[in-house]
From Swiss-Prot:
Residues 341-352 have a biased composition (Polar residues). Residues 340-359 are annotated as: Disordered. This is Ferredoxin--NADP reductase. It catalyses: 2 reduced [2Fe-2S]-[ferredoxin] + NADP(+) + H(+) = 2 oxidized [2Fe-2S]-[ferredoxin] + NADPH. FAD binds at residues 48, 56, 61, 101, 139, 304, 345. Its EC number is 1.18.1.2. Belongs to the ferredoxin--NADP reductase type 2 family. The keyword Oxidoreductase applies. One of its GO terms (molecular function) is flavin adenine dinucleotide binding. The keyword Oxidoreductase applies. Pfam families: Pyr_redox_2.
Length: 359
């Protein structure tokens, strides 16, 4: 199973839903948390600011080898994400990407305290607990640092590709030197009138296969590659993008450009989490270590964003943290029930569900 088959890549309209747990962050730790929620019978939704699940593993180093996941001798970061997506898929929990959790409001009702969480696209979740698995915080794209860029953002300047159809028949410039830049340049050459990849140097921080594919496409005349830095964005009187000025060793070169896709990578920022009334230190959330609960009861943190004595920033540590956090969250979601520990090997209902999904 790939990331593309485990969630909807198409933009989804805002939702309003009552659930047991909202998981903020769909990286490896958040994905395993979804599986654990399913094992415990908790309803949940995952939200992530990025346009696909996987967090840093998918966005920053998908080809990086990982050697310290139990029972896996080695796998790439993307392979780990794909396996985790396959593991939690039988429970059918929504993974809502391209939205950021903005506010967490406490609501008191006849059945006790719950939370009302809103997102950047207008989702509203009524939940018993919130589990923050946001890695190093919310990611934001590294923007084009030119004064004329802001007016073009969302119209002709893009930091992600959400709809390839909008580039049909256009002169497209893709700027960047990572996997995303090369992969999208290669993909769009079949749709756009012409694609030019721009990078500040000849070397790339991308998979060898992607680099080889790009160079082969350039050699075949299917796309162009230019070394240089974007120095200016040119617009028509009506505000449409017409071209870019490229600063090169030999001087300035102007490239025709209807749409610019800048894929310079991501920068980490705390985002709205800093205003959620949880104790933070150096950009991380302080938790206790019996259930990885924050200073705000019912709000938990796990993975790289969690801070406690002798904390190790390891994926496997995050797996343990969410397992413990969700068992405490179960109490908030089911105050009148006692969670009875059952080994998954003895849980016939769970086995039936997993086997049915595999068939």
């Amino acid at each position: 199973m790939t990331a593309e088959t485990a969630f909807s890549a198409a933009p989804l309209p805002p939702v309003e839903q009552r659930i047991d747990v909202l998981i903020v962050g769909a990286g490896p730790v958040g994905l395993f948390a979804a599986f654990e929620a399913g094992v415990l019978g908790l309803s949940c939704v995952l939200v992530d600011v990025l346009d696909r699940p996987g967090g840093q593993c998918t966005e920053l180093y998908p080809e990086k080898p990982i050697y310290d996941i139990p029972a896996l001798v080695s796998c790439t970061a993307q392979e780990l994400v794909d396996r985790l997506l396959a593991q939690c898929a039988p429970f059918g929990y929504p993974i809502l990407c391209g939205r950021r959790a903005e506010t967490v409001e406490t609501i008191e009702g006849e059945h006790g305290r719950r939370f009302r969480v809103t997102t950047s696209v207008g989702d509203v979740f009524d939940c018993a607990a919130v589990l923050i698995t946001a890695g190093n915080g919310a990611f934001a794209p590294q923007r084009v640092a030119l004064p004329e860029a802001a007016a073009l953002e969302g119209r002709h300047l893009h930091y992600a590709v959400r709809d390839t159809a909008r580039f049909a028949g256009k002169h497209v410039v893709v700027a960047g030197g990572g996997d995303s830049a090369l992969d999208w340049a290669l993909a769009l050459r079949k749709t756009a009138a012409r694609v030019t990849l721009v990078h500040r140097r000849e070397g790339f921080r991308a998979a060898d296969a992607s680099v080889a594919g790009m160079r082969a496409a350039v050699a075949a005349g299917e796309m162009d590659f230019q070394v240089g830095m974007i120095g200016r964005l040119d617009s028509a009187p009506d505000g449409t993008l017409t071209g870019i000025a490229l600063r090169q060793r030999e001087g300035e070169t102007r490239l025709p450009c209807d749409e610019l896709i800048a894929l310079y990578g991501l920068v980490s920022e705390p985002g709205p989490i800093a205003s959620w009334d949880v104790e933070m230190r150096a950009g991380r959330i302080v938790v206790e270590t019996t259930a990885y609960e924050t200073s705000r009861a019912g709000v938990f943190a796990a993975g790289d964003i969690a801070l406690y004595p002798n904390k190790q920033k390891l994926i496997l540590s995050g797996f343990h943290e969410v397992a413990m956090a969700l068992r405490r969250a179960y109490r908030y979601a089911n105050p009148d029930k006692t969670l009875v520990h059952t080994h998954t090997s003895n849980d016939t209902n769970l086995q039936s569900r997993l086997h049915a999904a595999a068939e």
